[in-house]
Amino acid sequence: MSYEKELAAAKKAVTLAARLSQEVQKTLLQSQVWKKSDRSPVTAADYGSQAVVSLVLERELQPDKLSLVAEEETGDLRKNGSEAFLEDIAKLVKDTLASEESYTSSPLSTDDVLNAIDCGKSEGGCKGSHWVLDPIDGTRGFVRGEQYAVGLALLVEGKVVLGVMACPNLPLASAVCATDNSSQEDVGCLFFATTGSGTYVQSLKGNSLPQKVQVSSNENLDEAKFLESYHKPIPIHGTIAKKLGIKALPVRIDSQAKYAALSRGDAEIYLRFTLNGYRECIWDHAPGSIITTEAGGVVCDATGKSLDFSKGKYLAHKTGIIVTTKKLKPWILKAVRESIEEENLYF
């Protein structure tokens, strides 16, 4: 089945949501406000991004009922005392949509914005079609003016069939070679993939044609690179790297942008192991998983099984997430299993 119409709508939705987030990030950096609280700029970006994506999908696809699995809900926005904050969010959404020529004359009330955000209350599941959204992934990177992502995926009968990810601060060339002197014209990526059609990247500004990407062809673990967030990883990551003989320093990127970077060969390994009891949300991995697998990569748990997105808002797995290339997968699985056994860890 072709998903051309859905892909076009998703690309437009994510591009506009990224535009909103970039405006908020500018304000954030100027004001030096960084804490994510109920009425912080970070939260405004989350709400605004979710509203924009919901409204664009509704307008472009006109479904009988939009099913969106997403992070935000409007309970706090509907409380007394939140009126001014809600007005600020509504203005962000209106201004963003007005920047798209086809939406300039569309009226929008605060109730419209609230209802759009609350479209994200879907539970997902194994039946029907569900959009899955992370409106702002990578809060730490976002507040520092560094890497974050807006990720959107489409689930059909429990399978991810489409993914779009905007990485507004990711260089078009390579995350590894980026410098402080990188031209702003070369920054901002839009990755997208549909099942069976490969993964592509183009400028988020829309001024370049899509280019097909592939994961790294490197088979030498001595030359392989890890992708890690800036916050301190749990110790097993270091144990696994040592077993594999990894010599290169990790490529540090916050958010799902790590999936995107791996899909185009910036690095070969991304591991995500969390503390016991933590449940992974599907919006943190659905967009990135198809972007990586359609580029020739592998996304699985520590037993080698593919991730299951059909169980609702949370992934049904307990053993971490491994993102790598098909060539390196056997070695990484072996190192992961040995490390888990040696450290007597339970996930």
Curated annotation (Swiss-Prot):
Adenosine 3',5'-bisphosphate binds at residues 139, 255, 258, 272, 284. Inhibited by Li(+) (IC(50)=10 mM), Na(+) (IC(50)=200 mM) and Ca(2+) (IC(50)=0.03 mM). It catalyses: adenosine 3',5'-bisphosphate + H2O = AMP + phosphate; 3'-phosphoadenylyl sulfate + H2O = adenosine 5'-phosphosulfate + phosphate; 1D-myo-inositol 1,4-bisphosphate + H2O = 1D-myo-inositol 4-phosphate + phosphate. The active site is at 46 (proton acceptor), 139 (proton acceptor). Signal peptide: none annotated. Mg(2+) 2 binds at residues 134, 137, 284. AMP binds at residues 255, 258, 272, 284. PROSITE patterns: IMP_1. Mg(2+) 3 binds at residue 71. Keywords: Calcium, Hydrolase, Lithium, Magnesium, Metal-binding, Multifunctional enzyme. Pathway: Signal transduction; phosphatidylinositol signaling pathway. Belongs to the inositol monophosphatase superfamily. Phosphatase that converts adenosine 3'-phosphate 5'-phosphosulfate (PAPS) to adenosine 5'-phosphosulfate (APS) and 3'-phosphoadenosine 5'-phosphate (3'-PAP) to AMP. May regulate the flux of sulfur in the sulfur-activation pathway by converting PAPS to APS. Prevents both the toxicity of PAP on RNA processing enzymes as well as the product inhibition by PAP of sulfate conjugation. Is also able to hydrolyze inositol 1,4-bisphosphate. Substrate preference is 3'-phosphoadenosine 5'-phosphate (3'-PAP) > adenosine 3'-phosphate 5'-phosphosulfate (PAPS) >> inositol 1,4-bisphosphate. No activity observed against 2'-PAP, 3' or 5'-AMP, inositol 1-phosphate and fructose-1,6-bisphosphate. This is 3',5'-bisphosphate nucleotidase 2. The gene is SAL2.
